[in-house]
C-alpha cells in the first residue's frame, strides 16, 4: 500500500536487440531527444515492434501512453509490456463497460432510449489503478489504453486533492475518517467488502481500495491510527505492516462539497435560461421534460453528492467555460510523457471519428429537452485537440497511413528484418472455383504439421456458415464476431494458442497486431472484391498474421488480379528479397517464433479478469489446495480426479442451498477438468 516513487524502468528480457532493431531503437531515441514531434516506425509482422519500443521506453525513462484501437490488442500489449517491465507500473485503461447503450432519442419515432450499461468491476479497478499510478509521483508508468483515453474524466487536481493520506501513529478521528471514505464514494459492507467497500468492527476498519485487489486494515486506538496492515480479504492472511497508505477515490468523477455547491448553482442558472428559451418558442413538452430530469439530478447531487450521468454536468463541476476541451486521461500525465500509437493506420482515424458521432447523438438530446446544452461539452477530444495535447508521438504500423507519414515528414524508421530470420510468407493467388474444398485440404495439411489457420471472409454470415462446415468436417474451429465481449475474444485467442482449437474464422477482427506464432496458414476468401477489407493495406495486414511461422503461407482466392493484390505481391517480393539478402550476409537460418504456455497465459492475462471475479464472488478463490480447470494441465491424474470429486460435492451442496448460479459454475468447471484429464489420460 506504500506509495512508490521509483523513476527507473527495468527492462527484463532474455534477448538482445537483433536484426534491424538496434538501428531502429537508436533512430527513435535520438528523434525524441532531438525534439521531433512525430516519428513513424514501419515494422513488418514479427519484427519485434513491441520489444523495440520497450527498449526505447527504457532508454528515455519517461511516462508513456500506449494507444491501441481495440480492447483485444490493448490486452495483448498490456500482457507483453508487463512481461518486459515486471518491476514497473504497467497499467490498463479501456472502457469498463461489458455492455453499453448510450442515451439517445429518435425524433422520427418519438422514441427515447435510456442509457443502459453493465460495468466490469475488474476493468474499473484497473482504470482506477492507472490514474492512481499517474498521480502517485512515479515516472516509470506505462498506460496501455484504447481510445477511452480521449473521453472525459474528472479533474486530476480535484482527484488528487481528495486522496486520503494515512500514516501509522498519526492523529485521526475514526468517525471523521469514515465520513471521508463516504465522500470518496466508498460503500459500507460489514459482511464481505469488495473493491471500493469497507467494513467496521469496533476500532478496526477493513478497506478494499478501489484500485487494489488486496485489503488494508486500519486499527485505531482512541484518536490515533495504531497500525496499518495489508491483508488478503478472502483468507484474512496478514501480508505485511505498512508505515503509510494512500486511499484514492472510488470513482473518477469526484468533487468536494464546496465545488459541488457552486456547480449546482451554475446548473440551476443554465436550466433557468434554457427553460425560458424553450417556453418562448412554445416548446412546452421539451421544457417540462428538461426541468423534471435536471431537478431530479440536482436532488440526487444534493443528497448523495452524485447522480447517474453526472458526467453530463462535468463542465460545471470542473468550472470550465463553454466549448473548452474536456479533461481526459492525457491530463493525468506529467509534461514530459510521450505517446506510442500502435497500428496507427487504424488508431488515428478512429480518434478522428469519435467526436462527430458523439456530437450528433447529444445534439438531438439537447434539442428535445433530454439534456442541457452543457452536456455537449462532455465529449471526446477533437482530433485537433488531441494533436495539440500529445507532446511527442511514435506511430507504429506495418502499413502506415497518410497522416502519420505526413506528420513524420515522409520519413520512416524501418523494421523489415526479423531477429528470427523469418521471411515474409509467400503469397499465392488461387481461383475461386472449388475454393472451399481446396481450403479444407490446405487446412488439414497445416493442422497435420501442428500449426493453426486463420480464414477471412467478407461477411459475418459467411463466417458462421464456414464455421459450421468446418465443424462438420471434424475441424476444431471457432469464429469471432463483433458481438463477442472483449475479454471473451481474448479467451478464444488463448484457446487457439494453447491448442484447444485449430482454426479461427473472422471478418475484420484478426488483422492488426495479433501475436499468433502458431498460425502458418492465412486464407482470404473473395480477395478480389476491392474495398475497405480488401485494399492493399488490409491485405498486407491480414497476410502478416502468418509471418511469425517458418511455414507461413498466404492464399488469396480470387479470379482477378486487382491493383491491391498486385501491390501486395510486389511489396512481399521486395521485402522477401531484403530479408533473404540479410540472412545470407549474416549466416542466419530462419526459425519460427516459439512461446511457452506460461507466456501465452501471461500475454492474455486480462482475459482472466472476469473469471477471477466470478471465483471470488462464489468464494472459490483463493484456496491453496484448489486448482480449477484453467490449471488442470499441471496436475497428476490422481490429484485431478480427487479435485473433481471435491468440486462435485461442493456443487451438490450449493444446489441443496439453492445457490444455483454457483452450482452451474462448478458443474462447468467439473466438465472442463474432466475433458483435460481425459485428454491427458
Swiss-Prot record:
Q: Which residues form the Helicase C-terminal domain?
A: 435-601
Q: Name one GO molecular function term.
A: excinuclease ABC activity
Domain Helicase ATP-binding, first and last residues per copy: 30-419
Gene source species: Chlorobium chlorochromatii (strain CaD3)
Q: Where is this motif: Beta-hairpin?
A: 96-119
Organism taxonomic ancestry: Bacteria, Pseudomonadati, Chlorobiota, Chlorobiia, Chlorobiales
The record's listing under NCBIfam families reads: PRK05298.1 (NF003673), uvrb (TIGR00631)
Q: List keywords of the entry alphabetically.
A: ATP-binding, Cytoplasm, DNA damage, DNA excision, DNA repair, Excision nuclease, Nucleotide-binding, SOS response
What protein does this entry describe?
Answer: UvrABC system protein B
> Keyword DNA damage, does the record have it?
yes
**Domain comment as written in the entry:** The beta-hairpin motif is involved in DNA binding.
Instruction: State whether keyword tRNA processing applies.
Output: no
Similarity section: Belongs to the UvrB family.
Function noted in UniProt:
The UvrABC repair system catalyzes the recognition and processing of DNA lesions. A damage recognition complex composed of 2 UvrA and 2 UvrB subunits scans DNA for abnormalities. Upon binding of the UvrA(2)B(2) complex to a putative damaged site, the DNA wraps around one UvrB monomer. DNA wrap is dependent on ATP binding by UvrB and probably causes local melting of the DNA helix, facilitating insertion of UvrB beta-hairpin between the DNA strands. Then UvrB probes one DNA strand for the presence of a lesion.
Q: Which PANTHER family match?
A: UVRABC SYSTEM PROTEIN B
* Highest taxon listed in the record's lineage: Bacteria
GO CC terms: cytoplasm; excinuclease repair complex
**Domain UVR residue range list:** 641-676
What SMART domains does the database record attribute to this sequence?
A: DEXDc, HELICc
Q: How does it assemble?
A: Forms a heterotetramer with UvrA during the search for lesions. Interacts with UvrC in an incision complex.
- Cite a single GO BP annotation: nucleotide-excision repair
Name the residues that bind ATP: 43-50
Q: Where in the cell is it found?
A: Cytoplasm
Amino acid at each position: 500500500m506504500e506509495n512508490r516513487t521509483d523513476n527507473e524502468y527495468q527492462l527484463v528480457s532474455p534477448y538482445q536487440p537483433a536484426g534491424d532493431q538496434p538501428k531502429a531503437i537508436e533512430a527513435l531515441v535520438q528523434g525524441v531527444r532531438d525534439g521531433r514531434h512525430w516519428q513513424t516506425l514501419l515494422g513488418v509482422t514479427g519484427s519485434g515492434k513491441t520489444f523495440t519500443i520497450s527498449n526505447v521506453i527504457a532508454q528515455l525513462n519517461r511516462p508513456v501512453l500506449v494507444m491501441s484501437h481495440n480492447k483485444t490488442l490493448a490486452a495483448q500489449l498490456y500482457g507483453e509490456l508487463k512481461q518486459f517491465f515486471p518491476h514497473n507500473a504497467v497499467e490498463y485503461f479501456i472502457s469498463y463497460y461489458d455492455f453499453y447503450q448510450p442515451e439517445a432519442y429518435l425524433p422520427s419515432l418519438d422514441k427515447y432510449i435510456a442509457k443502459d450499461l453493465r460495468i466490469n468491476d475488474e476493468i474499473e479497478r484497473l482504470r482506477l489503478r492507472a490514474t492512481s499510478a499517474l498521480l502517485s509521483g512515479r515516472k516509470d508508468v506505462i498506460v496501455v489504453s484504447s481510445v477511452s483515453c480521449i473521453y472525459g474524466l474528472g479533474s486530476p487536481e480535484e482527484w488528487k486533492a481528495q486522496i486520503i493520506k494515512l500514516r501509522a501513529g498519526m492523529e485521526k478521528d475514526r468517525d471523521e475518517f469514515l465520513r471521508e471514505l463516504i465522500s470518496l464514494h466508498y460503500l459500507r459492507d460489514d459482511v464481505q467488502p469488495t473493491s471500493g467497500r469497507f467494513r467496521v468492527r469496533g476500532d478496526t476498519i477493513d478497506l478494499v481500495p478501489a484500485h487494489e485487489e488486496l485489503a488494508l486494515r486500519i486499527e485505531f486506538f482512541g484518536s490515533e491510527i495504531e497500525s496499518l496492515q495489508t491483508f488478503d480479504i478472502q483468507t484474512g492472511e496478514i501480508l505485511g505492516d505498512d508505515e503509510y497508505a494512500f486511499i484514492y477515490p472510488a470513482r473518477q468523477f469526484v468533487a468536494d462539497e464546496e465545488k459541488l455547491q457552486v456547480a449546482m448553482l451554475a446548473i440551476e442558472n443554465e436550466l433557468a435560461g434554457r427553460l425560458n428559451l424553450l417556453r418562448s418558442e412554445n416548446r412546452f413538452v421539451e421544457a417540462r421534460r428538461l426541468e423534471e430530469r435536471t431537478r431530479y439530478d440536482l436532488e440526487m447531487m444534493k443528497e448523495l453528492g452524485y447522480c447517474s450521468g453526472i458526467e453530463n454536468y462535468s463542465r460545471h463541476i470542473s468550472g470550465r467555460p463553454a466549448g473548452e476541451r474536456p479533461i481526459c486521461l492525457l491530463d493525468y500525465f506529467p509534461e514530459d510523457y510521450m505517446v506510442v500509437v500502435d497500428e496507427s493506420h487504424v488508431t488515428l482515424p478512429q480518434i478522428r471519428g469519435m467526436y462527430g458521432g458523439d456530437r450528433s447523438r447529444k445534439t438531438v438530446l439537447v434539442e428535445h429537452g433530454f439534456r442541457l446544452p452543457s452536456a455537449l461539452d462532455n465529449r471526446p477530444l477533437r482530433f485537433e485537440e488531441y494533436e495539440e495535447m500529445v507532446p511527442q508521438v511514435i506511430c507504429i504500423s506495418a502499413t502506415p497511413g497518410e497522416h502519420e507519414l505526413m506528420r513524420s515528414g515522409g520519413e520512416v524508421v524501418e523494421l523489415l528484418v526479423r531477429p528470427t530470420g523469418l521471411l515474409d510468407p509467400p503469397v499465392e493467388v488461387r481461383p475461386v472455383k472449388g475454393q472451399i474444398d481446396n481450403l479444407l485440404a490446405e487446412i488439414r495439411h497445416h493442422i497435420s504439421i501442428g500449426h493453426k489457420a486463420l480464414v477471412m471472409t467478407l461477411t459475418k454470415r459467411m463466417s458462421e456458415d464456414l464455421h459450421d462446415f468446418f465443424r462438420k468436417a471434424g475441424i476444431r474451429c471457432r469464429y469471432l464476431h463483433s458481438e463477442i465481449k472483449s475479454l471473451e475474444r481474448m479467451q478464444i485467442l488463448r484457446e487457439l494458442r494453447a491448442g484447444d482449437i485449430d482454426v479461427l474464422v473472422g471478418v475484420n477482427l484478426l488483422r492488426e497486431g495479433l501475436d499468433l506464432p502458431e498460425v502458418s496458414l492465412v486464407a482470404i476468401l473473395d480477395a478480389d472484391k476491392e474495398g475497405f477489407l480488401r485494399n492493399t493495406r488490409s491485405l498486407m495486414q491480414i497476410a502478416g498474421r502468418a509471418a511469425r511461422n517458418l511455414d507461413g503461407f498466404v492464399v488469396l482466392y480470387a479470379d482477378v488480379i486487382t491493383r491491391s493484390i498486385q501491390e501486395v505481391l510486389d511489396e512481399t517480393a521486395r521485402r522477401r528479397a531484403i530479408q533473404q539478402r540479410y540472412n545470407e550476409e549474416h549466416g542466419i537460418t530462419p526459425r519460427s517464433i516459439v512461446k511457452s504456455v506460461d507466456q501465452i497465459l501471461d500475454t492474455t492475462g486480462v482475459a482472466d479478469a472476469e473469471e477471477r471475479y466470478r471465483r471470488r464472488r462464489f468464494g472459490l478463490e483463493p484456496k491453496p489446495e484448489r486448482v480449477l480447470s484453467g490449471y488442470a494441465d499441471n496436475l497428476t491424474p490422481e490429484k485431478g480426479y480427487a479435485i473433481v470429486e471435491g468440486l462435485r460435492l461442493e456443487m451438490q451442496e450449493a444446489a441443496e442451498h439453492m445457490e444455483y448460479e454457483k452450482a452451474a459454475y462448478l458443474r462447468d468447471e467439473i466438465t472442463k477438468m474432466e475433458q483435460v484429464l481425459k485428454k491427458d489420460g
